[in-house]
Amino acid sequence: MHKKRWAAFVLAAALVLTGCSAGSFLHFGKGSGGSTVQKIDRPAVESAELQFAHPAAGDTIAVFDTSAGVFKAVLFPDKAPQAYDNFAGLVQAGYYNGLTFSRVESGFVVEAGQGADGKGTTIWNGNRYPAETTDSLHHYSGSLCMGTDASGECASVFYVMQTLPGEQSVTQELVDQMNSAGYRAEVVSAYQTAGGAPYLDYTDTVLGQVYEGMDVVDAIGQAAVDENQKPSEDITINSVSITQYE
């Protein structure tokens, strides 16, 4: 993909997304605490793209136990080896246990992984690693990604795409921009169903895909936040574990 064409796509995508809003995919109800919650109807994605294959026995998965519930993601270590090594090492060390979600943008992302210093760390004495990108993985709704700083490097911060499905986040104008930028037809089709943020492709690392508990991610995404987009009431990561799918 030509860099100039990609840069033009990113700019246009950002302009398109400023006009996106919640719509017919949202249904209102009451949570156990009496607060209003929104159930998002997320359609099954029929696609040969890697992220939409149900995990097979032996696949590597991450289990996130949070105060809002449990969600699970299949990981792709061979597609982002440094990101996986760092994430798995931090999980083994218990780094994420007890941390809270530090940034929530409803209909966009839920983010965690910052330490007390607000910067995060790595298993390499805090030394960051470059973002790993591939045409095999994209920022569809439900993708598990590593945060990237202004220098294009990553540490412990991760986020899950909480974008709305279909044209609620991927408009026809954005589809046209993807086609102009040279996206594969299969990827465009998957974005049209799942929703997502293609303007983050080839800049941020995609490590995995949530396959169970997306309703929990959606609940986190609806938390009331302060002026810094931090949940007003802590949403805590009780534990993260890495295991094999059975």
Can you describe what each PLM-predicted range is?
Residues 1-18:
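Sec-dependent bacterial lipoprotein signal peptides
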Residues 2, 19-246:
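Cyclophilin-like peptidyl-prolyl cis-trans isomerases
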